[in-house]
Amino acid sequence: MAASDADAAEVERLYELGERLSSAKDKSQHAADYEAIISAVKGQSVKAKQLAAQLIPRFFRSFPALAPRAMEAMFDLVDMEELATRIQAIRGFPLLAKDAEFVSKIADILGQLLASEENVERDAVHKALMSLIRQDVKSSLQPLFKHVESGSEIREKVICFLKDKVFPVKAELLKPQAEMERYITDLIKKSVLDVTGLEFKLFMDFLRSLSIFGDSAPRESFQELIEIIQAQADLDAQFNVSDIDHIERWTSCMYMALPIFMRGGSSSKFLNYFVKQIVPVFDKIPEEKKLDLLKTVAASSPYATAQDARQLLPPVVQLLKKYMPGKKVEDINHNYVECLMYIFHHLAHKTPNTTNSLCGYKIVTGQPSDRLGEDFSEHYKDFTERLTGTEETVRAVSKRLTQGMADFNKAISSAKTEEEKTKIKSDQQKSTMTMRAYNNILAMAQPLRAKSPLFIGDKKITLSWMEQPKKPAPTTTGGKRSQPATNGNTPASKKGRGEGAARNQLVNRAFEGLSRGGRGSGRGRGRGGRGRGWGYR
């Protein structure tokens, strides 16, 4: 009973102090009253502490000399066991944000409180943080990103808060736009040095949505994004075929960069790494990772420069010949051949006379690199024999596959369970994709038979795993027929009708599956430390 009376007396005393401060014209003359309110935080009364959590922020600005003590008292309140006391203190924090120094400290504390397991408390933290950010974006975001950068235990909670609460209202918060977009870009660049694949995807997705990296941005801006991705791919490290995490990270990062290659970013560093580090040990790479590597390079090959094409063509030709049989065989690795032949066409389109010494062609550009005076007839004979063997094999396998495709619908109709139907449909889909690959191989092999062949350098071929372009509606009006790709000596070909679908697919592919994969053996979080995030499906 005595304790209850003491609590009531303490609460009543605080009410009186609060009323006196509210009515005072010159509050600075009542510093002792404010000190008494601050001291109540150290008392025994829970209700008095809750009331102090309301009164301290209310009069905070009137007593700058007592600001440090008031701030410490508020920090003590959010450490209390009583949930109601903590929530009251959290709600009062935005009222303490009178300058940048206090804002940073409060944002840091609120960032730590994001780890709360109580929904109502976490909701209060979200609202307090957003109120704080709206008051001072720079001073609020900087400590939050510090948690991400330093790898503190609550980093994932902070990232979720940024994703769910901050990023969606960037247009409201980032003003003036150019200055604040640059500020948050610099914060992100420091934070992504050590993140998981899913986290990296989140931050890159956000950066690409900023106006400073928009369609009208200068090419230097696109290159800045490429450099961020290059750093994540660890292109300065020696390639280790046993480091699955690095293989997955390289593949995922290059795919992530594809939309930026399309907009003018340079793929040179990725392609040079592929030539110098990956191709020499390609045979030693695990089979399940080889195809992802080849698909990545294939998708990026249309955006290679002529200089990169000259460097990349020799190893590509060697790999292509390895998987193209010299005579008809039972089957070929159609996925590898499709990728390599697609890469070959797009690179050769950029630098056609490079193929003279590699394949024995007779392409005339008037440059010394034509090497027309040298005899490469054996190369031509070998290459065309391999083309013949590949085509004969593909035609034979395609015929068998076509006959089998007709049986799928019958099998689905006769299937007794949904599980059986699902499996049959899955097999049918795989067969359809395989048929697309075979058709692509035949379409790409045919133009390579001439001494001066036609290299496909436009969007005529849609790789089998990409979204297939829709067929155009029939038209009765006349129109120009599309021109075949040439050796690269004519103006650039018009964009093919499948480009939009392919582009969307590439963007989706770049960002899908980044949270999958096993624990890596590389360095840091997401590279062995947290070890998740860089595997393809």
Curated annotation (Swiss-Prot):
<dbReference type="GO" id="GO:0005634">
    <property type="term" value="C:nucleus"/>
</dbReference>
<dbReference type="InterPro" id="IPR016024">
    <property type="entry name" value="ARM-type_fold"/>
</dbReference>
<feature type="region of interest" description="ARM-like and Heat-like helical repeats">
    <location>
        <begin position="9"/>
        <end position="363"/>
    </location>
</feature>
<keyword id="KW-0053">Apoptosis</keyword>
<dbReference type="GO" id="GO:0003729">
    <property type="term" value="F:mRNA binding"/>
</dbReference>
<protein>
    <recommendedName>
        <fullName>Apoptosis inhibitor 5-like protein API5</fullName>
    </recommendedName>
</protein>
<comment type="subunit">
    <text>Interacts with AIP1 and AIP2.</text>
</comment>
<dbReference type="InterPro" id="IPR008383">
    <property type="entry name" value="API5"/>
</dbReference>
<dbReference type="Pfam" id="PF05918">
    <property type="entry name" value="API5"/>
</dbReference>
<keyword id="KW-0539">Nucleus</keyword>
<comment type="function">
    <text>Putative anti-apoptotic factor involved in the regulation of tapetal programmed cell death (PCD) and degeneration during anther development. Interacts directly with the DEAD-box ATP-dependent RNA helicases AIP1 and AIP2 that form dimers and bind the promoter region of the cysteine protease CP1 involved in tapetum PCD.</text>
</comment>
<feature type="region of interest" description="Disordered">
    <location>
        <begin position="465"/>
        <end position="537"/>
    </location>
</feature>
<comment type="similarity">
    <text>Belongs to the API5 family.</text>
</comment>
<dbReference type="GO" id="GO:0009555">
    <property type="term" value="P:pollen development"/>
</dbReference>
<keyword id="KW-0217">Developmental protein</keyword>
<dbReference type="GO" id="GO:0043067">
    <property type="term" value="P:regulation of programmed cell death"/>
</dbReference>
<feature type="compositionally biased region" description="Polar residues">
    <location>
        <begin position="474"/>
        <end position="492"/>
    </location>
</feature>
